[in-house]
Amino acid sequence: MLTRQATEADIPAIMEIERTEGFEAYVGRSERAQHEALMAAADCHYVMLEDEVGLAGFAILQGVGAASGLLYLKRIAIRSPGKGLGKRFLGELIRLSFEEFGAEKFWLDAFETNQRARYVYASCGLQHDGVLREHYPLADGTRANLVVMSILKREWLTAEAQRQSQLAAQADARDPKLPEFMDAALADIASDISEKDR
């Protein structure tokens, strides 16, 4: 998985992903001029996701460098959901927000009906903050509820420290120390070799 900052050359691919069949109920859509304006904004950062096949997804972050320390994930979309890339991508976006952009809070909103995305967000440590009722106008004239979720920098740092500790413990388990009797046996072998060399 590789991430990079987007350029205007990526806009057609971004719009294609936004308009993937079945995404209309879960992913917002913007016209080219809107994407160009967002890319030009000082507080906005587009992130592209690539895998071994090519472009796999994108995200739009807003509030970069804001004095409030609030960084908003305006949009995230994966070309082929269900392969685990979304969770890994979100984890990288959260890390980027706190470590590189200096945010104090990372937040987003999601369609209340998008259970899969909300599950992924929760699995990355985001907590439920509330519901914006009938907040987003849909193409069919109805309005959708949005669920607000967030994670604080201190919460992420605590979770990251625990994750690193678990990884270290797993590494130790895969590479255990040699038992004392094996150490002794190896020492005897080394001694025999040394004797023969004399």
Regions found by a protein language model. Give the residues of each.
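Extreme N-terminal starter segment of soluble prokaryotic enzymes
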Residues: M1-L2
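Acetyl-CoA-dependent GNAT
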Residues: Q5-A9, M15-G82, L90, R95-F101, ...
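Conserved GNAT acetyl-CoA-binding A-motif
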Residues: E99-D109
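Terminal substrate-recognition subdomain of acyl/acetyltransferases
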Residues: D140-L167, M182, L186-I189
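Short linear interaction segments
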Residues: A168-R198
